[in-house]
Amino acid sequence: MQNSTLYPTVYVLGNGQLGRMLRYAGAPLDIYVEPLAFNAPVFDLPENAIITAEIERWEKTPLTELLGNHKNFVNQHIFGLLADRFTQKSLLDELNLSTSPWCLLKDKNQWNDLFQTVGEKVVVKRRTGGYDGRGQWIIRDENRADITDDLFGEVIAEKFIPFDYEVSIVGARFKNGEKRFYPVTHNLQQNGILRYSVVDCAFPQQSVQQKQAETMLGKIMDKLGYVGVMAMECFVVGDKLLINELAPRVHNSGHWTQLGCSISQFELHLRALLNLPTPELQTFAPSVMINLIGTNHNPKWLNIPFAQLHWYGKEVRIGRKVGHINLSHPNKAVIIQQLEKLCTELPEDYQSGLNWAIEKLK
């Protein structure tokens, strides 16, 4: 097994694309990162190892038990807390942070009161699991039967928010309480899956939203004693941010930092875990991230100037994230030109989102 000459090995619970990109980010600093599948064989875990995870929940296996019992599993108790939407939303209420009105849906007798107090349209979400739009239902009085008896107690119900648009912020907290934040990012989701992210520090409301988002996420990380990168997704309603979801890990909406920032979110996470010196983050230029979902590899993407392709090496399946493309340039007109070129190299279902990104940059 390879070892760093400078730092303990960082083991990542989960071996998907996030673990893979953490491994790439560590290499230039001689930080050895080893992503591990849940069913990988157990081994002699070094006493000084650092443990992190690329996902909030994991199955119980001999390996996850081994890692879970290690003294250096950073944020271990926080993963379970935030993986459950009931405890996550309870935390937001405890901190008096804005989020959509909600309740635990325990039984069918709650429906009438729920529609009266929350609204005629509610979003029902599984407490655990369910991501990228899965495990969620939009419920009105006429389709309440969609929530079957076995789901009661295992779901929360939120008010449906007719938001203006969606944003996120990715930040990190160090052991001494210092924090670093990336710019608020505008996101477009389609069918519950993040498809596009756009970053431009010249956006209207950017400075106001940045201050608000940093305060909110900072308050959460301080309360939890969190160390590492965390993401906060929000709805924008007028001049207010409503927290939608928290992710205690590197996040899809932070992928643009690989090209558009002085330190990527993956390197930042490792720096925080190892308590390494870290300057303030510098954003180089406006940036766009395009998720590649259920799309076969196209070598013509490599011919797009100022584009950075990340291909995950996964089997292509409908709805599966298989890669992403980052674009960054100080001149937004140049990014728009490259997005227009991508319009001819991506399937039809990408066109509306590419047009959304182009309009964002105009």
Swiss-Prot record:
Pathway the protein acts in: Purine metabolism; IMP biosynthesis via de novo pathway; 5-amino-1-(5-phospho-D-ribosyl)imidazole-4-carboxylate from 5-amino-1-(5-phospho-D-ribosyl)imidazole (N5-CAIR route): step 1/2
Reactions that this protein is recorded to catalyse: 5-amino-1-(5-phospho-beta-D-ribosyl)imidazole + hydrogencarbonate + ATP = 5-carboxyamino-1-(5-phospho-D-ribosyl)imidazole + ADP + phosphate + 2 H(+)
GO annotation terms (biological process): 'de novo' IMP biosynthetic process
One term of GO molecular function: metal ion binding
Domain called ATP-grasp: residue spans: 89-274
Pfam families assigned to the protein according to its UniProt record, in alphabetical order: ATP-grasp, PurK_C
GO cellular component, one term: cytosol
Alphabetic keyword roster: ATP-binding, Ligase, Nucleotide-binding, Purine biosynthesis
Binding site for ATP: 85, 125, 130-136, 158-161, 166, 244-245
Task performed by this protein: Catalyzes the ATP-dependent conversion of 5-aminoimidazole ribonucleotide (AIR) and HCO(3)(-) to N5-carboxyaminoimidazole ribonucleotide (N5-CAIR).
Family: Belongs to the PurK/PurT family.
Assembly and oligomerization: Homodimer.
PANTHER family attached to this UniProt entry: PHOSPHORIBOSYLAMINOIMIDAZOLE CARBOXYLASE, PURINE BIOSYNTHESIS PROTEIN 6/7, PUR6/7
The protein, known as: N5-carboxyaminoimidazole ribonucleotide synthase
Originating species: Haemophilus influenzae (strain ATCC 51907 / DSM 11121 / KW20 / Rd)
